Amino acid sequence: ETKSGMVLIIGYMNKDALDQTILTKQGHYWSRSREVLWKKGESSGMVHNVDDILIDDDQDSIWLKVTIEGLGASCHVGYKSCFYRSVNKIDNGEVTLNFTETEKVFDPEVVYPGADNPTKL
């Protein structure tokens, strides 16, 4: 996110997704599981408006700095970022996840009624 510097998502792009992102200045991505080009916010209204596009040194990774429309979240389960948990290792070797975001921005059942949620909580 442009304002906070927060990483919102890791998305995949093909040439069409990159072309559409540059053309429209809105985040477009390639869904590897559905094999379809999609625009972030197409169904939720939480569009990624692109403020800047950065390319890494060997030109195989792209970082979009974005401003989010609508409710201001990027994660389909309701959090601002898809990275809302951190790994915590406990002394006995058990690994747990700690929530770094404790409040959801929206209720996914309201925004995506009837949609399956593949995320493990």
Tell me what each language-model feature is.
Residues 1-121:
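Flexible "arm" and connector segments at domain edges
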